[in-house]
Each structure stands twice: as C-alpha cells, then as structure tokens.
Amino acid sequence: MEFVYQDDRFADLQLLRYRLNGFDELSLRQKKLIYYLSKATIFGRDITFDQYGKYNLRIRKMLEVVYCDATIPHDTKDFRALEIYLKRIWFSNGIYHHYGCEKFCPDFSEDYLHDVLGKVDASKLPLKDGESVEEMCQELFPVMFDETILPKRVNKADGKDLVRTSACHFYEDVSQQEAEDFYARMKQQDAGNEAPLSYGLNSTLVKENGVLRECVWKADGLYGNAIRHIIYWLQKALDVAENEAQKSYISLLIKYYESGDLDVFNKYCIEWVGEHDSAVDFINGFIEVYGDPLGLKGSWEGLVEYIDKEATHRTQTISKNAQWFEDHSPVDNRFKKAVVQGVSANVICAAMLGGEEYPSTAIGINLPNADWIRARYGSKSITISNITDAYNKAAKGSGFKEEFVIDEATLQLIEKYGDICDDRHTDLHECLGHGSGQLLPGVD
C-alpha cells in the first residue's frame, strides 16, 4: 500500500504524516531507548500549553469534555465548529495561532457552548475548588470570545509594555521594566563568571505583596507533576543508553530537572554537545526563547531522533569544511572565529515530537543557544530528513509549480534538483549559519 503523506485538513492547516525510514535497522536496545525518550517527550505537552497562555489548559480540557460527550448531537453546524476550534487548539498548543501568535476565536456562539456545558457531567470539567460551571464560564468565555482580551501570545510592538500586552504565561503581575531590571541585576552580579547562567530560562517571574520572585520549573516546583514523569522515563533511558557519555548527560539532565540549577544545565549542554557517537539523540527541556517577548524564558520542547546514515554523509562534508566557509565569509573579520570549534552536523529522522516541536516542527535545529558554550565547545546541527521529505512529497501534484514556473525546462530542473537543493539549503543554514561567527566582546 502506498504511503499517504497528507492527513486531516481544517482552518488554514494541512496535517502531514511522516515515515520512520531506517527504524527497523536499529537494534532492540536502540528502539527501547527511543521508546523511553518518547515517553519523556509526551509528558511535557501540558507544560507548553500552560506557557503559551494562562487559560489554555482549562479551555482545552473543558472543550474535550464536550467533544467526548456522546449525549450531545455531533452532526450540527455548531458542534463541527467546536471540533475545528478544538483541533486548532491541539495544533497550536493553545488558543493562539502557532505562527502569527494572534488569538483565533470560535465560530460557534457563547450560547451554544453555555448550553452544552449544562448537559455534560460537571465532575469531568476543569473546575477549581468550589467553582460552579457558571463561574467557570464567566472566567473563560471572555478569553475565548472577546477579541480585545489577551489578543496576542507574543507582542513585540514598539511603545507597548511587552510583558503586560503578551498573553504568554511567563510573568504574573509584572511589568516589562520590572522584569528587565530584575534580570539585569542578576546578570550584573554574575558579570565576572566565565560560565554565565541563562538567567530566567526555567522560571515564571511573579510579584507577590510587591516582591518579585521566581517560581522555578523543577521536580518539586512549578510543573512538578509533568517534570517528575519526564524524570521517570529519563531514568529508564539511562539503562539502555548507547555509551557512557550519553548516560552521563542524561544523568545531568535529570539532576537539572530535580534541582532547577542553571549551572547544572550548562554542564549538561557541554556534555551533550560533545557526544557524537550515539545513533539516537534527543532534546528535552526549556530551550528556545522566541515565545517570550523579552527573549529570556525557554518554552518546553521535546524531540527524539536517530541518524539518517546516508544523508548524514553530505552534512558532515559541510561541517568538516566549516573553517573554510568561516574564512571566506563576506563579513567583517571581527565577527569571524579564528578557529571554528566543534561544529557537528547530522541528518536525522524524528521519531517523536513534543511541546513546542509538536505538531508544527522545525526542519532544522542548531543548539545549544548559549553563545559562550558555542564559542568554546561548538554546536550540534541537525536537519530533519523525514519531515522535509513529508513536506516535499505532500506538495507534489498540487499544480502550483505547473501554474507558476516559467517554462518546461525550468520545471524539469526543479523536479530533478528541487528537493536536494532544499535539503542543502537547510544544511548550510543550520550548520554554517548558526554554527559560524562570533559576537563582539560585551555583547549578549
């Protein structure tokens, strides 16, 4: 049976399916490692939902109760609109568009939702202690239906308080100026540290009784329930790690999740970026800061991967010549590295995606993000081959190229070289783009 790449389609979204090429060739031990790491990836989902908006989890769970209730008619226009809205929430990890960050509102009415909520089993709804269904509706409906309330997840408009006008859930009752001053003081106190910490990366900044403090995301702190589940599966993964170096960095990641200590996170990043022998690798943690208007807080994400051996040969050819590209880069010499350190590049197959990486995932990744670690220890670049393959295969037959390509000769060139050129472009971007260059002294 021919593999079908296209799946469900709704709103402005087309879901794709992807293959796990080469999975059967992995050893049983490697497959177990992928399974355990995949379980650790799945348990981070609700962290991302909460980070993307204070009300996301309750809205999702409320609508899931309605969606699963067999007593409510499923063949009405309103129910179909509710289904599409819920699918969009699942896709975007909340009520904000996954790319534009603007809030999308339901195409069903408040009256309809109020009516069906009165018919479901109230014990299944995400009610707070002592809260009635009516009180829940009064709190959540304005967030869902009023376009003027919390309209954007990440706001970067000039002249606005970016923290107060962004719906992302990294700050509580805190202004932009207060947050910037809080972390500026931390960085100033740590100015002489040759291994600086990524202050604010793994915490929610709150103000209580006029005092600012961090609620750290760790096993006995905020998001503790999900993190403890992640730790459990990481501990299982320890027993089937591919080598001692991998076992060591998994142990450090567990220690980081248990303590919330950013110094441990630095040590984990250094060991992770230095391990190159395993076929199976993963990302699990609070990584990218694009979801925070101040660029400090890490959104949770997970990725489990294994090497695409054939395609990796081409990326390693690029990475082995990283110094040549650095030397010949058309930029000011002040921004060039004299010696390029540890640029590694692999083409991988994604076995499991989670959090910010799911379901709208990157096609290439370069980590770690800390500039000082990259400068001293290098970085890992990956191109995700089975995701790019799904994009390419799903796009065929749409008629787009036939309509807009200028002539038949050009069309034939695109058909022959288009996919591989796209892959080379991603390789160059991740490996040489993110892996090259240096900052001026004193610039963060």
Mark where each language-model region is.
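N-terminal-proximal low-complexity accessory segments that begin disordered
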Residues: 2-68
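Surface-exposed patches in mature extracellular/periplasmic domains of secreted proteins
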Residues: 46-49, 74, 245-249
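Active-site recognition of the HExxH zinc-binding catalytic motif
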Residues: 27, 243, 424-439
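Active-site-adjacent bridging/hinge elements
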Residues: 10, 34, 395-408, 434-444
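Compositionally biased, low-complexity linear motifs
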Residues: 38-51, 252-267, 443
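Contiguous, non-catalytic segments that form substrate-binding/exosite surfaces or channel walls
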Residues: 84-414, 418, 422
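Post-signal peptide N-terminal segment of secreted/secretory-pathway proteins
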Residues: 64-80
